Amino acid sequence: IASYIQRNSQYPIYQNTDVMYFDESVKGLETQLEDLAKAQKFIFMEYHAIEDAEAWHKIQKILEERVKVGVEVRIFYDDMGSIGFINTDFVKKMECVGIHCRVFNPFVPGLNLFLNNRDHRKITVIDGKVGFTGGYNLANEYFNYTHPYGQWKDTGIRLEGDAVQSLTVTFLEMWNAVSDKDANDPDFGKYIFHYDYKAQQTGFIQPYADSPMDNEQDGVEVYISMI
């Protein structure tokens, strides 16, 4: 399976990466907030759903503080995933405080052949060194601040080390894909770098992603092979 992913999706297999597992979303959020506050260069966040409420406000407060000291912050979210969670002026509000913000596949009522092509990723990258991913979005219900569907149970992981490079690439590919001006981004490479880190854990890590912008079914094939 790992060879298939590397061959078809070009996501390499890494070592030299420490992994922290969160059995509850709120534990992931708490650690995420701590790491966001330490950012020195850039923060990339890509999520299916963002809710302009308590959980996000904790994150936004830190993002605004990091922007003030020169950290580059980019937010990317799926429009349909965030319907009912945020207002239409969300992008403008983020830009006003220095946070770059883009939307994937804005919802337009009527016939739309790509209506179901959604971005379900949940990714945070901090300085290209630390990354978070998992099953939780940035909405109150995922952290049990609210309970519209009962007690929510989800998981997440924190990566530190070489494998974070794949999360960085995954974010930038989607970020650049929705804007013509970034189709050939000359600065893409400056976010992909090696740094002096010695992991305490051993093993292999292979972050990978399927894209809503093509007809490839790599994610499906991986799960079928596992089953």
Give the residues covered by each predicted segment:
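Charged, low-complexity intrinsically disordered terminal segments
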Residues: 1-227
